[in-house]
Amino acid sequence: MDFKKDRINMVDGQTAKKTVFATGIGNAMEWFDFGVYAYTTAYIGANFFSPVQNPEIQQIFTFAALAIAFLLRPIGGIVFGIIGDKYGRKVVLTTTIILMALSTLTIGVLPNYDMIGLWAPALLLLARILQGFSTGGEYAGAMTYIAEISPDKKRNSLGSGLEIGTLSGYIAASIMIALLSFFLSDAQMEAWGWRIPFILGLFLGLFGLYLRRKLEESPIYENDVETPARDNIGFFTIIRYYFKDILVCFVAVVFFNVTNYTVTAYLPTYLGQIVKIDETTTSVLITCVMAVMIPLALFFGKLADKIGEKKVFLIGTGGLTLLSIVAFSLLNTKSLPFIILGVFILGFFLSTYEATMPGSLPTMFFTHIRYRTLAVTFNISVSLFGGTTPLVNSWLVESTGNIYAPAYYLTAISIIGFIVIAVLHVSTAGKSLKGSYPNVDNKKDLEFYESNPKKALWWIKVKKNKNA
């Protein structure tokens, strides 16, 4: 392969940061919706599953609606992944945010069971399915886009900005529910108050659409657009040649999302039902821990750019292997300072994943197959192990009677993650994306790669004997 110096991408760092903000808005909206849903499960259950008298069973049905929607994410990943690889990243990102906004609004205006009977839970499920389908393309597309527009040496620190959107969206949801719960009675919340955040989510989506329409296509995608291998590559061919990378990506997404959904979706329920903390205190506690996670994620993102994301992965998986049971033990002391410490331990190690996943997962695949492979792998993993986490944890506690069952589940997942990452993952921090010339933001790096073609195109040796 002839080395062409003019294909090294000079990226403006400030422009990249603005782009991360525009892209992260979609993630903020996704998690605003998810956060509101998690905090209002009791009200949603009472409105859409009212024939079921047991509140705990209502909650399981409500979580089941969420879990079923997650099963649609791989289909969304396939559809939007193929479109994103063939027609560009921008077209997908503008489409998914529209669909997410519409599905969020729909939940807020749906009639309840007393009004339309079985149509109520059926339409709720359809709205969640649309949400799952659109988010199947959203997050993978956002990760891919940010990785492709970021300077290689800042990919993890800028990629962590996507997860800042996650945390900000969830914090906004938590604050809104806390304010509504403070000003409205429980009866008012159940009757109509829970709908307000879902309706307001439409405006967040419109703001995100406004910003995303101004985005430019990623330079790496445009430079690769004439690659003959772009078309007619089947998923079985991709699996055949990139099985190890797909396996590492799959496992990484498992331990990331089991931890993520345990903290963000299941912990509020656990603190309320098991630990017996009131809803307002739970909301404030989770919100404060997530606020602390924002600077932690930024710190670990910068650290990953310096020492490699593999070491940061191992900090997270190793820490949760050792301390998950400790954290849940602290939660069950019933002492608020120890409860805060327990939640903080989980949030601290989750922030290592928040910092590194967006910047590292896209590096596992070559440009012409990156979006679709990442989208399908990510969403199958999320569907099986992420969205089902609240349901699995609720079922484990209900069926075993053991309040530490969620800690055992998290520990087991972390052990598997630690082993797979330690043995199979190769750090790509600071290196160009596979199949692409480097992204640089200064003259020094540009001159270095111009005089060191093998460093610039390090991935050529990886692609030897691979035809996909």
Swiss-Prot record:
It comes from Staphylococcus haemolyticus (strain JCSC1435). Pfam families: MFS_1, Sugar_tr. GO terms for cellular component: plasma membrane. Its main location: membrane. The gene is proP. Keywords: Cell membrane, Membrane, Symport, Transmembrane, Transmembrane helix, Transport. It is found in: Cell membrane. The chain crosses the membrane at residues 20-42, 63-83, 91-111, 115-135, 164-184, 191-211, 246-266, 284-304, 312-332, 336-356, 376-396, 403-423. May be a proton symporter involved in the uptake of osmolytes such as proline and glycine betaine. Belongs to the major facilitator superfamily. Metabolite:H+ Symporter (MHS) family (TC 2.A.1.6) family. This is Putative proline/betaine transporter. GO terms for molecular function: symporter activity. It is a multi-pass membrane protein. InterPro entries: H+-coupled_symporters, MFS, MFS_dom, MFS_sugar_transport-like, MFS_trans_sf, Sugar_transporter_CS. It comes from the Bacteria.
